[in-house]
């Protein structure tokens, strides 16, 4: 976070989970004065922040869906996830966000790339197709129903 504040010389809002705050305090880690710690936000407030940010850097598992959704409504934003893997490879395949890893070098490179693509107008403009599927609930019900017998027999050892 400090490296981003130094490189871009702009305020950074750090929506900090209470456990993270305690850990930072326990280690004595000092944040750059441009980094402003903030209590976790509600979903609506956080979405408004995302739409109006220079870039969004998060370890949230919902970042892929959020970046895909905002692209679909014409408000794409540079999204960078500080993780080494994702549960949403389909969003990665559609370039809705960038995985930065957890190193300072990887983070700086990912943010630079995402911001440059945004400046060029090269961020995705369409959502991940799976996320736009309006029949997903029906599909999930059918999948669960289809596997109930197999799971009962093989996992729970129920006699049918």
Give the positions of each predicted feature.
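Nucleotide-activated sugar donor-binding and catalytic core shared by glycosyltransferases
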Residues: 2-10, 15, 20-160
